[in-house]
C-alpha cells in the first residue's frame, strides 16, 4: 500500500509570511510619501527657475525692465500656480503642495 504524501504550506508558515509582508509594507509606505513631497518641492524649484529664465529672456529681447506680472504670464508651467508678487517675493504653489519661495529676480531686469 502506498503512503499518501501531502504537500503545501502549514498555517504557521502562511501567518509568518503575512507578518513579514506587513512589516515590509509598514516600512516602505512612509518612504513613498516622502518621495511625493520632495517631488512637489522639485516642481516648485523648477517653476522658479523657469520664471527666472523667462525674465532673462524678456530682458534680452526687449532691453528694458519687464513687470513681474508680464514675466509670470509669459512663463508656462504646469502642476501649480504662481502667486502674484514682486521681483523679490514671488512664490509658486505646486498642486497639492505648499508654496515655494522663488529666488529674487534682479531689479535690473524686473520691475
Language-model regions, residue ranges each:
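Periplasmic/extracellular, small/polar-rich flexible segments of pilin-like filament-forming proteins
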Residues: 53-111
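Aliphatic-rich helix starts adjacent to a transmembrane/signal segment
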Residues: 33-49
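A contiguous, well-structured "functional interface" segment within a domain
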Residues: 1-9, 95, 109-111
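Regular, well-ordered alpha-helical segments
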Residues: 26, 34-37, 53-56, 60
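N-terminal single-pass transmembrane signal-anchor helix
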Residues: 3-32
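Surface-exposed loop/turn and secondary-structure junction residues enriched for glycine/proline
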Residues: 4-7, 38, 60, 74
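Short, contiguous, well-ordered secondary-structure segments
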Residues: 1-8, 19, 45, 51, ...
Amino acid at each position: 500500500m502506498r503512503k499518501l504524501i501531502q504537500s503545501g504550506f502549514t498555517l504557521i508558515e502562511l501567518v509568518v509570511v503575512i507578518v513579514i509582508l506587513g512589516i515590509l509594507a509598514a516600512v516602505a509606505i512612509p518612504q513613498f510619501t516622502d518621495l511625493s513631497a520632495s517631488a512637489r518641492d522639485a516642481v516648485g524649484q523648477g517653476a522658479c527657475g523657469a520664471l527666472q529664465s523667462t525674465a532673462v529672456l524678456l530682458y534680452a529681447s526687449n532691453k528694458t525692465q519687464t513687470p513681474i506680472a508680464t514675466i509670470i504670464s509669459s512663463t508656462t508651467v504646469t502642476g501649480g500656480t504662481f502667486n502674484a508678487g514682486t521681483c523679490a517675493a514671488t512664490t509658486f504653489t505646486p498642486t497639492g503642495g505648499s508654496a515655494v519661495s522663488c529666488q529674487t529676480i534682479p531689479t535690473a531686469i524686473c520691475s
